[in-house]
């Protein structure tokens, strides 16, 4: 089990005074708590690429958010798939850029009479990590309807139901699920529709009007359980990685 965006101290087994995480606590009691375990990077995509490849950012090249993980790198999910595992990804991946900006999109502009490098020499690596095969998580394509699904196998995952972005701005496959459950989901999402709350001061944070039953995490739990149930019916003896 690898938890995404979870502070180490936001577990009751780590001493949090309010939060209760009984299931994770039971795993901790039966296993090992690593108190000096460090992420490979401070940025999201860099750490995810390290988890997938077992390599440091200096080797896999994802040194910043907005840099796609190259398909040239072997992932542990590909190895599991090759060994006969059923593989599925439901939720956030962020192995490819999904925002509206980033190093691969925000290119250097020559000014004051400078000369830009010729095409093909603008990056340290000649083989591009953009274009075909690298737009699976690009949210503008999901919003416009240009993209309806992820190209599989996706870094080793045969079944993919994707979530992009964060909070109540999540898109991808989740957005279709949300639209099936509310006639006007955008009326509940975003800062303009947030519940007023003076406790929120960070510009990227607000109290969402989206009810818990429609949270992205609710979708992940529902669809994850559905996939597990289907797998148990269809291939009960096949190992899996979700």
Per-range role (PLM):
Residues 1-242:
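Formylglycine-dependent sulfatase
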């Amino acid at each position: 089990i690898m938890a995404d965006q979870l502070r180490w101290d936001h577990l009751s087994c780590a001493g949090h005074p309010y939060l209760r995480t009984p299931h994770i606590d039971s795993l901790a009691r039966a296993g090992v708590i690593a108190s000096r375990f460090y992420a490979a990077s401070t940025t999201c995509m860099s750490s995810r690429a390290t988890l997938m490849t077992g390599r440091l950012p200096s080797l896999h090249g994802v040194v910043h958010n907005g840099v796609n993980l190259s398909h040239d790198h072997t992932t542990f999910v590909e190895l599991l798939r090759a060994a006969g595992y059923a593989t599925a990804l439901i939720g956030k991946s962020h192995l490819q850029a999904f925002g509206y900006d980033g190093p691969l999109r925000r290119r250097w502009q020559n000014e004051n009479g400078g000369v830009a490098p010729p095409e093909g020499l603008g990056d340290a690596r000649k083989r591009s990590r953009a274009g075909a095969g690298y737009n699976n998580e690009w949210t503008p394509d999901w919003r416009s309807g240009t993209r309806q699904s992820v190209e599989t196998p996706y870094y080793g995952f045969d079944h993919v139901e994707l979530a992009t972005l964060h909070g109540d701005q999540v898109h991808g496959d989740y957005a279709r699920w949300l639209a099936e459950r509310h006639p006007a989901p955008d009326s509940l999402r975003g800062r303009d529709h947030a519940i007023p709350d003076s406790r929120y001061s960070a510009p990227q944070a607000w109290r969402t009007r989206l009810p818990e039953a429609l949270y992205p995490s609710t979708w992940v739990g529902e669809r994850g359980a559905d996939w597990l149930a289907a797998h148990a019916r269809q291939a009960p003896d096949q190992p899996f990685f979700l």
